[in-house]
Amino acid sequence: MDGRVQLPVIGFLKKYFSVHYVDVVSEPGPNRILAEQSDSKTVKSILNRVNISVQKHRSKGIAIVGHYDCAGNPSDKSEQISHLQAAISFLRKHYSEIEIIGLWVDENWYVNEIPGNNIGRPLKNAQFC
């Protein structure tokens, strides 16, 4: 949702997935929402929008993003990374046939893949600005 992360993330994803366009499904603190799954209405809304992206737009991958100074998830980096990892696990249950990655946008607005992103897959771009 935060405009400060949109362009760096879109640029990263265009390069990472070798695509011209990126669908954006935005919520404040999506990593925490999908990790905790306590707000079923919002989780369902996110999944409905991701379904459109994957099924109708034939998206090549899904990225879940956390970032520095997030108002929707004011947790520290370590906890947000844990939320990202849990969110990835949750999304992989719904989308097992598509690549799902977690990204952390730091205080300098650099996009970084989180550790353990692609178990068994080669790391494409560790950092992008």
Where are these regions (language model features)?
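Short Gly/aromatic-enriched secondary-structure transition segments
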Residues: 10-17
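A short beta-strand-loop structural module common to alpha/beta enzyme folds
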Residues: 20-30
